[in-house]
């Protein structure tokens, strides 16, 4: 459920940066699963000194154990080994990697104020190492998450000036644009859009900068300019970028709607194919209905409803009784829980991701320990997350909290479950809180964006096939033509 290593280059590609750091590569391929975690815990417990400190180990062994702990999100235990290495081997070549590990572990725990000094030290003391450059870079997203957007933008710009051939140079340009938007400096953001397009002309980075310009104008309600930019994007190759033809057409049609050109908007909406796996096609069908194009909307929805009913993918409702019970307790839609479960684990209770997410709902141990007490589970360990009832109970507690944060917008709830509610709050603010499709366009992580598309499509399918009690829908009651009413009500 947490952000993984395939994130987009658009704003805070944290996990990708961490996956490619020297720390992750310092010991080659090593086992980092549940068995490895249990083994290093036994070793540490058996060899601690009388005052409880870690036993003296080689620098390599400290790094090996820290990597295993970190891969399992046992952050405090990982930090103990990194700090031991720094203290015992201050001149070792692995010190920068250990410092970066400590910083990133605090970062992943959202302890940004504690992460910041480690990133600053890396950039200051080790600028010629990969960890030093990454540390310098990560000062920016850390400042952003501390609510210091203007300083964050300046730091991205400092990275560009100091490391013009740095590993994250394209990311720094793109992140500067969106961070300036968050700092309330749209004109400066426009200047950086032009710089980015010139420097990276003919590349996906330049196209992503153009897409950032489109999103900026939509957030400002500059609909005429948004239409012009949409047309320009549609003439550009979109492969390898953060957008698609369907998304750009949706944004173009939405902008035309806001300009009062309903006929042309309807024509563009009809160009977006609707299918069982087309999120923007689904939204386009809804917009057509609202524009009075009832016959076209019903025909599109009927085709998709037939696809869903003949698909073999949604014929069962696994763990129905548990899902219904916790959904009722938390005021959640059980069909959304099933949609998330399907995407997270394909209903496999023993599933485990590379990011140490476990079980049916792919919970990480830090989230489980935070929300376990709210599910009346006072002590939760890693292996408990493979138990279906525990996984569903804790996930429901978390989803209930997210639903309170983002009422009437399941896309934001789903995005939070994958990419973090702090990120979603920023994306929602940038979007202007207008429309689900506008919000989704602002999602800054490629994985999270794709995750939202998939989960919402599954949600549509389950709403078509099942009632809120997970009983089979009668054909005349199926609601595959639109989002559930609670979400549709948020669309102007």
Question: What are these model-predicted stretches?
Answer:
Residues 448-452:
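Short, flexible loop segments at boundaries between secondary-structure elements
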Residues 421, 459:
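Short amphipathic alpha-helical/adjacent loop interface patches that line ligand
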């Amino acid at each position: 459920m947490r952000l993984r290593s395939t994130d987009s280059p658009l704003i805070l590609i944290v996990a990708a940066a961490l996956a490619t750091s020297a720390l992750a590569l310092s010991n080659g391929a090593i086992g980092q699963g549940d068995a490895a975690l249990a083994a290093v815990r036994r070793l540490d417990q058996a060899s601690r000194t009388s005052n409880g400190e870690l036993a003296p180990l080689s620098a390599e062994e400290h790094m090996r154990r820290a990597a295993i702990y970190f891969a399992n999100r046992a952050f405090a235990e990982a930090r103990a080994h990194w700090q031991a290495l720094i203290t015992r081997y201050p001149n070792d070549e692995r010190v920068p990697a250990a410092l970066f590990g400590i910083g990133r572990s605090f970062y992943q725990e959202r302890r940004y104020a504690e992460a910041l000094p480690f990133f600053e030290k890396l950039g200051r003391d080790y600028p010629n190492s990969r960890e030093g450059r990454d540390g310098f870079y990560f000062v920016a997203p850390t400042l952003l998450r501390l609510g210091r957007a203007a300083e964050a933008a300046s730091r991205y710009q400092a990275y560009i000036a100091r490391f013009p051939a740095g590993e994250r140079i394209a990311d720094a340009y793109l992140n500067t644009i969106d961070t300036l938007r968050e700092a309330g400096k749209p004109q400066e953001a426009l200047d950086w859009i032009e710089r980015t397009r010139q420097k990276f002309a003919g590349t996906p980075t330049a196209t992503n900068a153009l897409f950032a310009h489109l999103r900026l104008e939509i957030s400002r309600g500059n609909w005429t300019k948004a239409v012009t930019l949409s047309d320009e994007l549609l003439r550009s190759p979109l492969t390898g970028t953060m957008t698609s033809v369907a998304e750009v057409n949706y944004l173009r049609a939405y902008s035309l709607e806001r300009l009062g050109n309903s006929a042309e908007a309807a024509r563009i909406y009809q160009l977006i194919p609707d299918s069982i796996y087309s999120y923007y096609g689904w939204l386009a069908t809804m917009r057509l209905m609202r524009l009075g194009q009832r016959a076209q909307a019903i025909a599109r929805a009927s085709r998709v409803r037939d696809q869903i009913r003949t698909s073999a993918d949604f014929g069962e409702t696994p763990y129905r009784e548990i899902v219904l019970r916790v959904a009722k307790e938390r005021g959640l839609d059980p069909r959304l829980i099933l949609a998330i479960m399907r995407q997270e684990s394909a209903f496999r209770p023993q599933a485990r991701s590379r990011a140490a997410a476990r079980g049916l709902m792919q919970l990480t141990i830090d989230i489980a320990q935070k929300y376990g007490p709210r599910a009346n589970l006072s002590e939760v360990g890693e292996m408990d997350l493979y138990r279906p009832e525990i996984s569903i109970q804790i996930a429901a507690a978390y989803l209930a909290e997210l639903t309170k944060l983002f009422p009437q917008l399941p896309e934001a709830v789903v995005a939070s479950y994958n990419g973090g509610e702090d990120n979603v709050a920023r994306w929602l603010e940038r979007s202007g809180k207008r429309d689900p499709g506008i919000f989704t366009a602002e999602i800054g992580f490629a994985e999270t964006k794709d995750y939202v598309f998939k989960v919402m499509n599954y949600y549509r399918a389950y709403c078509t096939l099942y009632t809120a009690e997970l009983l089979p829908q009668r054909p005349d009651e199926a609601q595959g033509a639109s989002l559930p009413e609670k979400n549709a009500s948020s669309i102007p």
